[in-house]
């Protein structure tokens, strides 16, 4: 890991990018990359997780809190499909007012009236459901899948190092729990994506630790289909508005080292 850390921190950007491209080409030699057209739908912004980096959420009973109706979500799906979209990413805050059956009914409604691939309910949400409704996480996943959930997004991953999570999101599923839920989903035959949000006070070594933990799980299950990374957007966040914004080179270096580490 020390050599990787030195390479990530110190190698010229073009050298780092060239190595990342070499790894990519070894796996995909025909010069073809793929993508999908999808849309994020945040079904509620009411949340009790109180993450320091989140400018989106509103506490319960806040005047700006909302929960979308099934019909509003259906309209957004139809707008997506009209533009060529093939998937929706549906996720939201940890809303203590929504019963578990609502989520199951929503999935059934979507599949019945607006059929589309539903990529939804991150490990953090699954953990919240399990705690809130006194269920095992595996049973939450099975119930959601049975109602129509197709795959699970990597939301709530942030940095999978507990020191960082204790500062940025102490009320949300911890690093081990996040990985555990992903492994449970893979064990149920579900594919998932994985994310990393950086710039929240972690070190470069902790970013690499995040990637190494993801790589180890992928080696066991093969269940991850995509990795997405992005920097903190500090404006209007509860506790991180003072954090410096990272630059474009940091983003390119982070994408490159992720391609090198996540070669499986």
Predicted regions and their residues:
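Flexible, acidic/Gly-rich N-terminal and inter-domain linker regions that tether
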Residues: 1-49
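Glycine-rich, proline-tolerant flexible connector loops at the mouths of alpha/beta enzymes
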Residues: 8-9, 35-41, 58-64, 89-101, ...
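Active-site mouth loops of central-metabolism enzymes
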Residues: 38-39, 57-71, 124-136, 167-172, ...
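Cys/His-rich metal-chelating microdomains
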Residues: 50, 54-57
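Radical SAM/AdoMet-radical enzyme domain recognition
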Residues: 51, 86-88, 100, 104-197
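Conserved alpha-helical substructure of the radical SAM core
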Residues: 58-92
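Short, acidic/polar
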Residues: 70-77, 134-143, 211
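Conserved C-terminal portion of the radical SAM core fold
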Residues: 92, 113, 118, 146-157, ...
